[in-house]
Every structure is written in C-alpha cells, then in structure tokens.
Amino acid sequence: MQAISARRLFDGNSWLEDHALLVDGEHIAAVLPLAEVPTDAPTTDLGDMTLAAGLIDIQVNGGGGVMFNIDPSADGLATITSAHRQYGTTAIMPTVISDTAAVQQTAANAVSDAQARGEAGVLGLHLEGPHFD
C-alpha cells in the first residue's frame, strides 16, 4: 500500500485537514488521518496542496491550443485531454460546436477510436446544433 497526503483533502462530503489516501494498487483503500498511516507505507506528501477526486467536464470545446472543431482528429483529441488533465479534469466530453456533417463525423470517429484504444478520459461526444437560430 501507498499513502498520498495533503494539507487539505476533499473526500466527497467534507474537507479534511492533514489526512491521507491509502492506495492499494489502483483502488483507494482508506481515507485516514496522517497519524494513522502505517509507518511502512511509502508516502507521497503533496504539502500545502489540495487533494480531491478528478473533475469531469461534459462540454469541452478545446484545450492546449486546439479547438476540436478545427482539429477533430485523434491527435487533436489527445492534446485536449492532456491539457485538461494538467488542471485536474480527468474525464471530458469533447464538443463540436454547430458545424458541418463532415466535421461532426470526423469528431465522432476520433472519439470512437480513442475509446476503442482504451484511452482514459474520453467519455463520449457532445454535439451542438446543427444550427443556432
């Protein structure tokens, strides 16, 4: 098991101070006060940072200098998800703003391919439009 500690931790219900996550493989085994962390557990201390679950954004037009309408490709999508991940957003729905059927189809293919490859963080596709009045 490994511990990740931070000055502030949000457990989904409350803000906790001086607590840690106890992680077993890919799963959170416990949230506990620092004093209760097993002494043999390797610990990553995030210092004065805040530890919280990853955020989900269901309408993402772009990120990392890429607008999904302009670059609805696998590479564009990878740049967007990577940019959002840096700021705590772990899952997104890339959005195509009202555009042509060809752009919408290309975007749908990029999202479908990313999901088929098991790329983390792409929940689906948000299509707007096809037209705004």
Residues of each region from the PLM?
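Hydrophobic pocket-lining residues within nucleotide cofactor-binding pockets
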Residues: 9, 51, 68, 96, ...
